[in-house]
Amino acid sequence: MWCKNQVGSGNMDLRRDALQILKETSRTFYIPISILPPGLQEAVASAYLCMRAIDEIEDHPELDNATKAKLLRAISLTLQAGVDGFALDAFSAGFSGYENTLAEVTVGIREWSLLAPETIAPRIWDATAAMADRMAYWAETNWKIYTESDLDRYTFGVAGAVGLLLSDLWTWYDGTQTNRTQAIGFGRGLQAVNILRNHTEDLRRGVDFFPEGWSAADMQEYARRNLALAEAYTNSLPTGPALDFCQIPFTLAYGTLDALANGKEKLSRSDVFALIKQLIDVNVKAS
């Protein structure tokens, strides 16, 4: 039984489920995705959830690295075989024996892959498959980052490439043109902030994304350098859904950097909502 990407009541249910899972997994991205127009919303939600599905494998506390690599490569190969959808059991063989261990968002990857409109869905499958392969490589090396080039390689693989995908989604939706080098910086900058925020927790599980000899100040500098590209990327966007989307994670990333520099562990929920309200107020005045 094959399921194409169709618009209908089933797709409405899938969209509702996707937004609910999104809300449970990431408030940071739930808000900007929830304000996107129909069509683009499904595409960006599909991309986010497919990538979150593989990210949950990469970060899974109960799986060893060899198992992570095996699961990630199985997902990649399944996505590469997509034609006009995926059989109901397409991903099951790859998950066999791990169904009760994996996160709900991971087990639901088939549904997320079918959420985007069919004219763009294969681009999301492509990006997710490539990212899963890269994650498998990093799992096998236990995420050993020795140099800044290693860090650039990692942040491109799991985030800079997301910036490239978003650029393709904006162009697909309404023809918006963007600078792809800045798009990579957008992804890398957000990822560098995550690395800073999660550094202590990562060390506890035996993973260190800091290049050898780097301090938090060095990673701050790396994050700010990439966020300068992210700022150029965001500022170049015309008024519209792409700008509305990008402003929110960009603003929260800068807010998180400032909070970390001032000794806080992260932004509080009230900080997040205050920053977003400020952004909305500015946009309302500008419109």
Language-model regions, residue ranges each:
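Catalytic cores of Mg2+-dependent Asp-rich isoprenoid enzymes
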Residues: W2-L190, L196-S287
